[in-house]
């Protein structure tokens, strides 16, 4: 497949644009995760970036992508409310994989936000969405602009939540190509990859956490809970970056 140009794709009538992406995804569905990364690096335009929350399975995508592009910018949007274990995990993986880590934060400090707005995460869906906009979405948009990212790799998987169940390998999001190399992996494949390459889950995985974000909106998994119920009090699954 020839190098994809977003401008050319956008010039197509909507039906043809959808069909073109569907055809590409049909081919990508048949490729391994490693080959999807290779295809993306060879065929998608401009600066590639990789995002990571340094969550439970973060080591998989970080290792998978940086094996093929060691200097790819790895974007972390740091809310200032991550678990201590997460900050240590970030340090460990950054050193182990020699990551080109790029950290972006809200323009207001956590303390200033609390003084101005109170604890937004305790203010229902509207408060959580405002919190995410300030601490996740705006810093991410600034990161993409600063780094001039045109191709975005991320480690989402369909079996993580209902909101991700139908995501394609390749999509166009806000004028940027977004490629999800392990979108169709299950927990067994994640485990096998980590074992094969001497990598670890996030340290809180052993304490019963299936998904890890901020300290105030993350819960341990309990019997009967869906994975998405462990985040944001079950009110929503996404932090705004992948909606």
From Swiss-Prot:
Give the principal location in a single coarse category. cytoplasm
Annotated active site: 239 (nucleophile)
Q: Which CDD domains match?
A: PAPS_reductase
What GO biological process terms are annotated to this protein in UniProt?
hydrogen sulfide biosynthetic process; sulfate assimilation, phosphoadenylyl sulfate reduction by phosphoadenylyl-sulfate reductase (thioredoxin)
Superkingdom classification of source:
Bacteria
Has UniProt tagged this entry with the keyword Ion transport? no
| UniProt keywords, alphabetically | Cytoplasm, Oxidoreductase
Please give the Gene Ontology molecular function terms for this protein.
Answer: phosphoadenylyl-sulfate reductase (thioredoxin) activity
What enzyme class is recorded for this protein? oxidoreductase
Recorded hits in InterPro entries, A to Z, give:
PAPS/APS_Rdtase (IPR004511), PAPS_reduct_dom (IPR002500), PAPS_reductase_CysH (IPR011800), Rossmann-like_a/b/a_fold (IPR014729)
| Pathway per the UniProt entry | Sulfur metabolism; hydrogen sulfide biosynthesis; sulfite from sulfate: step 3/3
Cell location: Cytoplasm
Tell me yes or no: is Oxidoreductase among this UniProt entry's keywords: yes
Q: What is its EC number?
A: 1.8.4.8
Q: Which family does it belong to?
A: Belongs to the PAPS reductase family. CysH subfamily.
Q: What is the purpose of this protein?
A: Catalyzes the formation of sulfite from phosphoadenosine 5'-phosphosulfate (PAPS) using thioredoxin as an electron donor.
Know the name of this protein?
Phosphoadenosine 5'-phosphosulfate reductase
- Chain's gene name: cysH
């Amino acid at each position: 497949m020839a190098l994809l140009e977003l401008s050319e794709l956008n010039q197509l009538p909507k039906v043809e644009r959808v069909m073109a992406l569907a055809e590409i995804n049909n081919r990508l569905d048949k490729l391994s995760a490693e080959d999807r990364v290779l295809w993306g690096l060879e065929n998608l335009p401009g600066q590639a970036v990789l995002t990571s929350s340094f969550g439970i399975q973060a080591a998989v995508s970080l290792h998978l992508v940086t094996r093929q592009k060691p200097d790819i910018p790895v974007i972390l949007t740091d809310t200032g409310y991550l678990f201590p274990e997460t900050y240590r995990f970030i340090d460990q993986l950054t050193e182990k994989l020699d990551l080109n880590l790029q950290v972006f934060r809200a323009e207001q400090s956590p303390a200033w936000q609390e003084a101005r707005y109170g604890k937004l995460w305790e203010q229902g869906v509207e408060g959580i969405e405002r919190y995410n906009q300030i601490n996740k979405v705006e810093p991410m948009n600034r990161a993409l602009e600063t780094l001039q990212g045109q191709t975005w790799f991320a480690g989402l998987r369909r079996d993580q939540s209902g909101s991700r169940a139908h995501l394609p390998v390749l999509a166009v999001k806000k004028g940027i190509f977004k490629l999800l190399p392990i979108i169709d992996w299950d927990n067994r494949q994640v485990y096998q990859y980590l074992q094969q390459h001497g990598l670890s889950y996030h340290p809180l995985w052993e304490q019963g956490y299936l998904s890890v974000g901020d300290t105030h909106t993350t819960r341990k998994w309990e019997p009967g809970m869906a994975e998405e119920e462990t985040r944001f009090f079950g009110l929503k699954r996404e932090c705004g970056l992948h909606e």
